[in-house]
Amino acid sequence: EDPWERLAMVREGAPNILLQMLLRGANGVGYKSYPDNVVKYFVREAARGGMDIFRVFDSLNWVENMRVSMDAILEEDKLCEAAICYTGDILNPDRAKYDLKYYVDLAKQVEKAGAHIIALKDMA
């Protein structure tokens, strides 16, 4: 199966519906890091093939690892949804790092990086 043909068929069959995909930051749609030019090219082809919304995340919430993808999405004038990976209890006073401030600061970072939408991704 050719995923680009599949995307074209879906777009043709649902021309007025927003299509969304998940993008693993520097890993693209794979499980290893890819060079920046590969990630940019993939985003460009997916955007031009009909993808409207790209949900981007990094499993360690490292915004720099999401930036190439986010920049490529914005260059293609598509919607960028930055997903923040969340687990735990943000209101537990015993949690020294992953508290409410951590997630608010992270949300501000992805907003500054250009995210149109911020999602919380439960890692459970």
Regions found by a protein language model. Give the residues of each.
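Alpha/beta enzyme core
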Residues: 1-18, 24, 28-124
